[in-house]
């Protein structure tokens, strides 16, 4: 900022840092300390372990034992995927049922589950029973669920036991939004101000939020649900579309957490991003 005398005057900045990643909580340099924990003093190691123990819902006393320390080391950073069994990943295998020259295919179906597209191709008995024995001479193509071993078995994951959605009313919120809510709270608190104090100091149209995922939200509460629900017997909804937008996390924090009317923007990726 230039003064009337033409000299540059430094602008005071109050900067906060917050968030959550596989190493833990960003504020207070806790996540960084987890990365270099073997090089820290005993006192700083203990503070880092205690911070992670509380985050992972393992804090019992003001100190932790060696078993707790080993658990924390094994369940932070990059490690074997814990969210699902990597040796048993659901897969769909296409199959075709072919009738022989002399016999028809026979199988049981419940009335409500007979697809409309197959009714004209099936010999459906006239019965009041809920389960019908149907026959057909035509080829029937189906997808048979089976399991395969994942080619990816390790990844960076949030510390085991940490659930950002349990910290607020997060019903139907995608995982990325839950993490953004936590990150925004962590960052604001690290400045030493509360949200109410910031609102009193800064006009709502001068608060900007820039946040988002390059790929948008992809879990079952967002684009994942929008794209897969119709294929697995569930109902997709317009809510999945709105919650999947890349900028949605930033917009949500801006509108519902801060009550701001300032600028928002998402972080959109491209091939060159890598």
Locate each region found by the language model.
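Short pre-catalytic strand/loop immediately N-terminal to key active-site residues, enriched for Gly-Thr
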Residues: 262-269
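Short conserved active-site loop signatures built around small residues
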Residues: 274
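Conserved "HGTGT" condensation-loop signature of ketosynthase/thiolase-family condensing enzymes
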Residues: 1-215, 219-262
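Short, structured patches in soluble enzyme cores that scaffold and shape functional sites
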Residues: 213, 269-271
